[in-house]
């Protein structure tokens, strides 16, 4: 009996030794595998970094990363070694997201990631206090973070053809240097209050949205000289539009306007307007030009058309003043 006990104890001891050895061997193999994977990652990052370095150019004194029509769904962290970059131009590379570490590129002046498949803007974008141009057109972005308002140097913002953006955070009115804003081909139903309160805005494109009317507070955009509103559903214009003294270009083609209001006569700085493809009530024929060249260059639904329409409207006793937006319209506060 005692011999059996001794024999069993010896077997258990040997078993325990072997189990420890096997466990240690497995741990060693795991560490070895992890080490090899780490080496592979380091090697891949070095290869990526080498490829990225080859894409860096210098133009007009700026250090630019320029990639187009290559497959870069994500950007490696090794890119951080190129933190001297001042401009990114990454087009048609299938990029799925802006890297979270974007905020560490403190020297960035231009970030152009148009024509990719980006779905969101990281909050870290707000750390780019030197950024002057942000181009994110032709992506799949649905919302804009309020942190973008921290980009105090931003002068140009393009979010065209994302198709699903319907509003902007109010905080974007703090972009005191923003002069150029492109929101065309999205889902806006009104001009956001943030836009109406951007003090330096000079150029705005909200074409191909779902605008039905313009807010009375549109007059706040006193520095605006160019306004694109083509391909919307606008039915009337507010009287306050005539107070936009610096407006020189106004495009209203492909809307639902039935009349051109008399108040637009006051807009003496207008140099170009377009009322083409609106269901206007009056049919207006422009007087013939003195020569063929003038006839060819004349805009059929432009400035002369507008003034002629207003005159015809007066003769017909069909004067239409600029409308005030209806009580249920969305006004811009603050």
From Swiss-Prot:
<feature type="coiled-coil region">
    <location>
        <begin position="10"/>
        <end position="47"/>
    </location>
</feature>
<dbReference type="Pfam" id="PF23598">
    <property type="entry name" value="LRR_14"/>
</dbReference>
<protein>
    <recommendedName>
        <fullName>Leucine-rich repeat-containing protein 39</fullName>
    </recommendedName>
</protein>
<dbReference type="InterPro" id="IPR055414">
    <property type="entry name" value="LRR_R13L4/SHOC2-like"/>
</dbReference>
<keyword id="KW-0963">Cytoplasm</keyword>
<dbReference type="InterPro" id="IPR050216">
    <property type="entry name" value="LRR_domain-containing"/>
</dbReference>
<feature type="repeat" description="LRR 7">
    <location>
        <begin position="223"/>
        <end position="244"/>
    </location>
</feature>
<dbReference type="InterPro" id="IPR032675">
    <property type="entry name" value="LRR_dom_sf"/>
</dbReference>
<dbReference type="GO" id="GO:0031430">
    <property type="term" value="C:M band"/>
</dbReference>
<comment type="function">
    <text>Component of the sarcomeric M-band which plays a role in myocyte response to biomechanical stress. May regulate expression of other M-band proteins via an SRF-dependent pathway. Important for normal contractile function in heart.</text>
</comment>
<feature type="repeat" description="LRR 9">
    <location>
        <begin position="269"/>
        <end position="290"/>
    </location>
</feature>
<feature type="repeat" description="LRR 8">
    <location>
        <begin position="246"/>
        <end position="267"/>
    </location>
</feature>
<comment type="subunit">
    <text>Interacts with MYH7 (via C-terminus).</text>
</comment>
<keyword id="KW-0514">Muscle protein</keyword>
<dbReference type="GO" id="GO:0035556">
    <property type="term" value="P:intracellular signal transduction"/>
</dbReference>
<feature type="repeat" description="LRR 5">
    <location>
        <begin position="177"/>
        <end position="198"/>
    </location>
</feature>
<feature type="repeat" description="LRR 4">
    <location>
        <begin position="153"/>
        <end position="176"/>
    </location>
</feature>
<feature type="repeat" description="LRR 6">
    <location>
        <begin position="200"/>
        <end position="221"/>
    </location>
</feature>
<dbReference type="Pfam" id="PF13855">
    <property type="entry name" value="LRR_8"/>
</dbReference>
<dbReference type="InterPro" id="IPR003591">
    <property type="entry name" value="Leu-rich_rpt_typical-subtyp"/>
</dbReference>
<feature type="repeat" description="LRR 3">
    <location>
        <begin position="130"/>
        <end position="151"/>
    </location>
</feature>
<feature type="repeat" description="LRR 2">
    <location>
        <begin position="107"/>
        <end position="128"/>
    </location>
</feature>
<dbReference type="InterPro" id="IPR001611">
    <property type="entry name" value="Leu-rich_rpt"/>
</dbReference>
<keyword id="KW-0175">Coiled coil</keyword>
<keyword id="KW-0433">Leucine-rich repeat</keyword>
<feature type="repeat" description="LRR 1">
    <location>
        <begin position="84"/>
        <end position="105"/>
    </location>
</feature>
<keyword id="KW-0677">Repeat</keyword>
């Amino acid at each position: 009996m005692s011999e059996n006990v001794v024999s069993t104890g010896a077997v258990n001891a040997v078993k325990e030794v072997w189990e420890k050895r096997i466990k240690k061997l497995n741990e060693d193999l795991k560490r070895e595998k992890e080490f090899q994977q780490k080496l592979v990652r380091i090697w891949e990052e070095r290869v990526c970094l080498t490829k990225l370095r080859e894409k860096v150019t210098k133009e007009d004194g700026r250090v630019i990363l320029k990639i187009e029509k290559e497959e870069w769904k994500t950007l490696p962290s090794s890119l951080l070694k190129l933190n001297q970059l001042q401009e990114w131009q990454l087009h048609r590379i299938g990029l799925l997201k802006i890297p979270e570490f974007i905020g560490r590129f403190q020297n960035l002046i231009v970030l152009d990631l148009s024509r990719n498949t980006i779905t969101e803007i990281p909050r870290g974008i707000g750390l780019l206090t030197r950024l002057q141009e942000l181009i994110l057109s032709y992506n799949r972005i649905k919302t804009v973070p309020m942190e973008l308002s921290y980009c105090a140097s931003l002068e140009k913002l393009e979010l065209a053809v994302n198709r699903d953006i319907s509003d902007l955070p109010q905080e974007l009115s703090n972009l005191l240097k923003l002069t150029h804003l492109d929101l065309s081909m999205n889902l806006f139903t009104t001009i956001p209050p943030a836009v109406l309160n951007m003090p330096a805005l000079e150029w705005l494109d909200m074409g191909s949205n779902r605008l039905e009317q313009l807010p009375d507070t549109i007059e706040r955009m006193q520095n605006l000289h160019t306004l694109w509103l083509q391909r919307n559903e606008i039915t009337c214009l507010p009287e306050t539009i005539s107070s936009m003294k610096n407006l020189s270009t106004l495009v209203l083609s492909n809307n639902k306007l039935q009349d051109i209001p008399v108040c637009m006569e006051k807009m003496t700085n207008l140099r170009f307007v377009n009322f083409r493809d609106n269901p206007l009530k009056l049919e207006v024929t422009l007087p013939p030009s003195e020569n063929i060249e003038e006839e060819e260059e004349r805009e059929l639904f432009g400035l002369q058309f507008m003034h002629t329409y207003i005159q015809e409207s007066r003769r017909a006793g069909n004067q239409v003043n600029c409308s005030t937006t209806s009580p249920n319209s969305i006004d811009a506060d603050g």
